[in-house]
């Protein structure tokens, strides 16, 4: 009996070790680009090759096998890290928080600019682009990811998670986020695009009407030149009336 118990214990331990070493279920999800047309470089775990591979993510409707960095993919799926890595949101305006070890420091709310850069609510904006951005959630005191439409946002909108944390949970000076080579190119202002479209829609019909009227004018001029009697009628004067009456009198 003792031998059988030892054997059963070894089998149980082996099964537990195998389960611990196997990647989480999210790592077995297939590659999903998504229907949106953005172009973000992301990483996924390939269960066949057992390696983390880079792919292009469209920006929405992805799955959990979607990591911001190769290190996140490696720690989660290959090393089997306990902490979940940052996941790209699966739909527009979906919040994703990145867990941090330990307690977050208290936000220094009395600092100049804190209300603009950290306490302002998340603003997606009316435009329909799909840019991954970060904002500081005052209630949870965490930096969260969201999808930014591309225009009419506010200052609680960061390109990088690290800058969000340093701005809103540190004790340094709050400043504008510096530009970076990997940042998205600035979009043209929405009023300008709408005004240009309105001008084109207003001018184009006027041009078409002008061309049509000009063509009709040329057409009628050509007809009048071919048939002069249509344009210049016979002039009837009083002398013609007298001659007509005299000829009738002689006839009688």
Swiss-Prot record:
Regions that span the bilayer: none
InterPro entries: Kunitz_BPTI (IPR002223), Kunitz_BPTI_sf (IPR036880), Prtase_inh_Kunz-CS (IPR020901)
Tissue: Expressed by the venom gland.
Keywords: Disulfide bond, Glycoprotein, Protease inhibitor, Repeat, Secreted, Serine protease inhibitor, Signal
One Pfam family in the UniProt entry: Kunitz_BPTI
Superkingdom of this protein's organism: Eukaryota
Cysteine disulfide links: 27-77, 36-60, 52-73, 118-168, 127-151, 143-164
Task of the protein: Serine protease inhibitor.
Name of protein: Putative Kunitz-type serine protease inhibitor
Record lineage: Eukaryota, Metazoa, Chordata, Craniata, Vertebrata
């Amino acid at each position: 009996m003792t031998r059988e118990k030892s054997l059963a214990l070894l089998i149980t331990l082996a099964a537990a070790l195998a389960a611990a070493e196997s990647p989480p279920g999210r790592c077995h999800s297939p590659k999903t680009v998504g229907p949106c047309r953005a172009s973000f470089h992301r990483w996924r775990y390939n269960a066949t090759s057992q390696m983390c591979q880079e792919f292009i993510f469209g920006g929405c409707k992805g799955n959990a096998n979607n990591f911001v960095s190769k290190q996140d993919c490696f720690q989660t799926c290959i090393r089997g890290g306990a902490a979940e890595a940052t996941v790209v949101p699966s739909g527009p305006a979906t919040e994703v928080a990145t867990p941090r070890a330990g307690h977050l420091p208290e936000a220094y709310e009395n600092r100049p600019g804190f209300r603009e850069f950290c306490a302002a609510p998340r603003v997606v904006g009316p435009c329909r682009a799909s840019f991954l951005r970060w904002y500081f959630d005052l209630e949870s005191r965490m930096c969260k990811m969201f999808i930014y439409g591309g225009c009419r946002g506010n200052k609680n909108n960061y390109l990088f998670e690290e800058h969000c944390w340093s701005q809103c949970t540190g004790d340094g000076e709050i400043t504008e986020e510096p530009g970076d080579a990997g940042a998205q190119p600035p979009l043209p202002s929405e009023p300008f695009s709408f005004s240009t479209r309105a001008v084109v829609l207003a001018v184009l019909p006027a041009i078409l009407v002008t061309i049509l009227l000009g063509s009709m004018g040329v057409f009628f001029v050509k007809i009048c030149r071919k048939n002069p009697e249509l344009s210049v009628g016979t002039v009837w004067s009083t002398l013609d009336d007298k001659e007509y009456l005299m000829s009738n009198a002689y006839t009688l």
